[in-house]
Amino acid sequence: LLHRVENYRFRDWKDIKHDSDIYNGRLLHNRVGYTLSEKLPMLMGLRAEPWFGTLEEELIQKIPEEGISRNDLFSDYPKGKDNAHIQRSLKSALSNMERQLVVAKQFVDVPNRKRSMAIFKRLHGKVKPLPFDKALTELISRIGPVRLHTLRLFVSRPVEELADTLRELERRGSIARVVALQPDPTDYYSSHEDAERL
């Protein structure tokens, strides 16, 4: 990314990481990344409706508006060797919520502490996801031209739904399909502006 950024100093990272507009979460294909709060509706719109077990339901109700640390979130549950299975279940439930972008983290600088403190913020029910077709159009305009195979890394919906939505967006004129030879003909999806430049 550095070749795309001007006047960036590595010491600026701390300011970026602790900015209240920056979220850390499993954004793409279960990989952890950082994004701006304004991009959350698009990223959430690319995902299917989240699935909740009873433990996930319980945990999400405990997250206040201002967020909560993991220690505080788990504080009401028994600890120790005898309860290791409970702690494993809690970590698994929280990880499941992160994977589905139900929650994301923000980092807070705490005085006299070497590392930043991670605060879990609830996104589900607080941030309204874009409809899938709009989220897909926005994604393509940001990263296109892009192949179907690459789009699958960003979308956690069935590939059939993705292919149907791409066909519908192309039919509506929201996106363009460009065929490139590499060496076989390959479909790329892009905005009309990008398609004209190619």
Protein language model features and the residues they cover:
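Long, low-complexity intrinsically disordered regions
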Residues: 1-198
